[in-house]
Amino acid sequence: MKKFLTLVCVSSLGGALTLGAYKHFFEASEITKVVENQPKASLFPVNLEKHFDGGTNIDFTTAANKTVHSVVHVKNTTLSKGYTSFEDLFFGRSQQREQIGTGSGVIISPDGYIITNNHVIEGAQSIEITTNDNKTFDAELIGTDLNTDIALLKIESDESLNYTTFGDSNTAQIGEWVLAVGNPFNLTSTVTAGIISAKSRDLSGQNTQSFIQTDAAVNPGNSGGALVNIKGELIGINTAISSQTGSYIGYSFAVPSNIARKVVEDIMEFGNVQNGILGVIGGELNSKNAKDFGVDQTEGFYVTDVQIGTGADRAGIQKGDIIQRIDGITISKFSDLKGFLNTKSPEDEVQVEFLRNGTIERLIVTLEKLTMIEIPIIGTLEEASKEALQNLNIEFGLQLSELSETHRKGWESDGIYEGSFVTEINDENINSVNDAQRALEKYSNKVLRIAVVKTNGEKVMYRFR
């Protein structure tokens, strides 16, 4: 039962779906995001030829023409240490080698802001943008969000740039025609077509994602490219594919535009993502869980607890309520709820429609600032009071409110319990959830270093790979 519970107010890390970039020394290669999914299909971020009924009246030319000139090629250059001979390896003499990865991006403003995937530019020493008319620009990384795999870049141009406008991904319908535009296999802007196959797809198995699923062909190098409707409006950022080979075999996945837009707007305004929380604990209903909880509903979000003092608590949400809609958006599973909350900010008011004792009720809930974060290796961290910090004679840190159940025994055997503090992550002082998010974004695929102050005041440093 405990595994069923999901803490809605916690912004889970997106590392579960972080898939490796295919990079080779001295030559460019397309960055591909892959997700292992049992022995079934795996998942890659990235385009098969389709043959459409010649009798269809759908015209894709307007959307294609509006989009191809705003989709760009992204080249990510990194430097890594390597050994050129056995002697170098034996004596520890390493040399820096250049690695290049490529992907796609979408210009979203005439002054050069570009949205792409975080995994496309991760670890870059330099980023080069090539537009559809073969002009090249050096790009500045403005910010990233590991949770949603979204990054914001900026280029400077003397001319106004072609750009794509955001559409409303909430209004996109299953069965609706869409175009995927990107730069697969280092080609210039390439357009493929398909339909929306599903919405609110969670590929991680941890209820942390909410993708648009399409059958538009997407291949290595398409990561960060545009998913647009037939009006040419941006409704998603192509991020992953379902495949066992690394190439397209039927399904691709995109971050919904409403989520991507919220992320980049927050990065522009605050430098990081501001998450609004509801303040409830629970999980999605299905036939098994419904039986466990003694309810006859098999869809919706079942509230097992309400956090004291949160917006949900003040509004009157109660344990046992089944959330079915928020602001008119149907909540049939957790990824629906997660996807909706990822588009909202602290202080936003939302109308929550829920089932209580067989009666539909509605309440207005004010979302609050995210004050906690989950690090899977250790557990849930919360912003603490000054008194709690003073009790351990420390000036900053996040307090460990709940140990990871998976690793609890190991931590407790080392004297780490709830109430301990994480004061540093990757050599960065941690005084807020935003500090922790930024530090973790620098971690990906590297050694993770965490400084912990025990409840007895002892400070210990841990390293994880």
Spans of model-derived segments:
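Short, low-complexity, Pro/Ser/Thr/Gly-rich segments in the mature regions of secreted, periplasmic
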Residues: 456-464
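Helix-turn-helix DNA-binding module
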Residues: 421-423
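Short, exposed beta-strand-loop hairpins at the edges of beta-sheets
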Residues: 441, 450-453
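Serine-dependent protease modules
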Residues: 3-319, 325-349, 355-362, 366-396, ...
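Conserved catalytic motifs of ABC-family nucleotide-binding domains
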Residues: 320, 419
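A beta-hairpin/wing motif
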Residues: 281, 464-465
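Alpha-helix N-cap recognition
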Residues: 333, 432-435
